Design a protein with these regions (language model features):
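Residue signature of alpha-solenoid helical repeat architecture, marking inter-repeat boundaries
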Residues: 6, 44-46, 93
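TPR/TPR-like (Sel1-like) alpha-helical repeat modules
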Residues: 65-83
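Terminal, low-structured helical/coil segments at or just beyond the last alpha-helical repeat
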Residues: 96-122
Length: 122
């Protein structure tokens, strides 16, 4: 990847992260999808996992608990074995957050604002 495309990827990730962290799930999905189309290998798998988490949150916001739980689990599965991939995101803390949220969803526990996933930049 040349310097220009690396800068473009970082800019795109910054935009996508902000959308995600502002709970703009649909827009974050679109932003991460653009990134997903430009990467491959493990990076692509991580981005796909984040995409799935974003869609899971969209489902959750619409009251679709089953869809949210399934997509959250699939997204977590894609990311948790690839936490060493350097995308400028703290994937370890992200996975911990997702595991806690998944457990609450699976056990039908009450959720609060602090349960929404957050992508922490490194």
């Amino acid at each position: 990847m040349n310097e220009e495309s690396t800068k473009s990827l970082k800019d795109s990730l910054f935009t996508a992260l902000n959308l995600f962290n502002n709970h703009e799930w649909y827009e974050a999905h679109d932003a991460f999808e653009e990134i997903w189309n430009s990467v491959d290998g493990d990076e692509r798998q991580v981005i796909q996992g984040i995409l799935q988490v974003s869609v899971s949150q969209f489902h959750l916001s619409k009251g679709n608990l089953n869809g949210a739980t399934i997509l959250l689990g699939e997204g977590l599965g894609r990311i948790k074995t690839r936490t060493k991939i350097d995308l400028g995101i703290d994937l370890v803390s992200f996975c911990q957050c997702l595991e806690e949220l998944l457990s609450k969803l699976q056990y039908n526990e009450l959720l609060n604002e602090n349960d929404k996933p957050f992508l922490k930049p490194l």
